[in-house]
């Protein structure tokens, strides 16, 4: 099956492309994945891997909140946000395997890489905490990711542009959901305000990493900071919250998540994420 454009192809309804472990089709089936002239396929693959890992790892952390949210409505909302990010991860990892010519599958990327081979920002792998921690992480992550995806809508790679275009619609909701809860908690009771501020304080040391320049980029990360700050400040003002002043957590010799250097939490996360696939690598069900 072929399509007139990449966006039409990746948004076409085809359930067989979304069923794990049942012989599903490539999520980019029917999409022209030819790397445009003048674009380095290896660099494109590396960049898609970064963004795909961000989505995959943060999706996993959100899934851990299933049955733990304060209301049933929020159970559904958080689960849907996790599924949105998982869908983005699938498309981006599949694009990486096509762009560099390796034909490596999304499952191979997700389940058969070591911790040091993952390229997600460390913010995505932070665990646990209370609901205020979750909302703070989601707020920061979604404000940043939406600004990034909006710029990628004009990417020279039509497949990446289509993935970004689809993602913008999803992450706009994620950002709005997080902002509404940040205001509700921050401008609520004394306890809810304290919890939300605690969440922001905990996540803040990992914010600078989101805007650190990297040798492989299709959008200059530092250019996203002004928009991020402006939007976050608007939310904080309405929520009566303070911008944290804690410093950034440095990497190892300047190396951070994009370089495969992660927090100690990452190993435990991958042990859970990859356990079934590694124990039964050829299983189908």
Which residues are covered by each model-predicted region?
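Acidic/His metal-coordination segments adjacent to aromatic residues that form catalytic metal sites
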Residues: 29-47, 111-138, 155, 185-189, ...
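Extended, helix-rich structural scaffolds rather than catalytic motifs
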Residues: 194-285
């Amino acid at each position: 099956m072929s399509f007139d454009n990449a966006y039409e192809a990746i948004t076409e309804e085809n359930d067989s492309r979304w069923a794990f472990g049942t012989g599903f089709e490539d999520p980019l089936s029917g999409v022209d994945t030819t790397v445009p002239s003048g674009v380095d396929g290896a660099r494109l693959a590396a960049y898609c891997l970064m963004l795909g890992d961000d989505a995959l790892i943060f999706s996993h952390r959100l899934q851990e909140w299933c049955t733990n949210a304060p209301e049933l409505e929020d159970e559904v909302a958080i689960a849907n946000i996790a599924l949105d990010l998982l869908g983005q991860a699938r498309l981006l990892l599949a694009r990486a395997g096509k762009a560099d010519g390796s034909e490596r599958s999304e499952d191979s990327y997700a389940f058969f890489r070591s911790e040091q081979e993952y390229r997600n920002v460390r913010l995505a792998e932070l665990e646990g905490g209370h609901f205020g921690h979750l909302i703070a992480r989601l707020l920061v992550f979604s404000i940043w990711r939406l600004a990034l995806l909006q710029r990628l809508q004009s990417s020279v790679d039509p497949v990446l542009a289509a993935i970004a275009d689809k993602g913008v619609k999803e992450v706009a909701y994620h950002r709005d959901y997080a902002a509404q809860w940040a205001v509700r908690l921050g401008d609520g009771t004394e306890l809810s305000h304290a919890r939300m501020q605690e969440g922001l304080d905990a996540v803040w040391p990992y914010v600078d990493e989101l805007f650190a320049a990297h040798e492989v980029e299709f959008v200059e990360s530092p250019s996203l900071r002004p928009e991020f700050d402006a939007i976050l400040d608007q939310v904080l003002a309405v929520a009566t919250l303070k911008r944290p002043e804690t410093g950034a957590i440095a990497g190892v010799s300047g190396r951070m998540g994009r370089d495969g250097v992660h927090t100690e939490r990452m190993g435990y996360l991958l042990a859970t994420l990859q356990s079934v696939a590694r124990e039964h690598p050829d299983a189908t069900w």
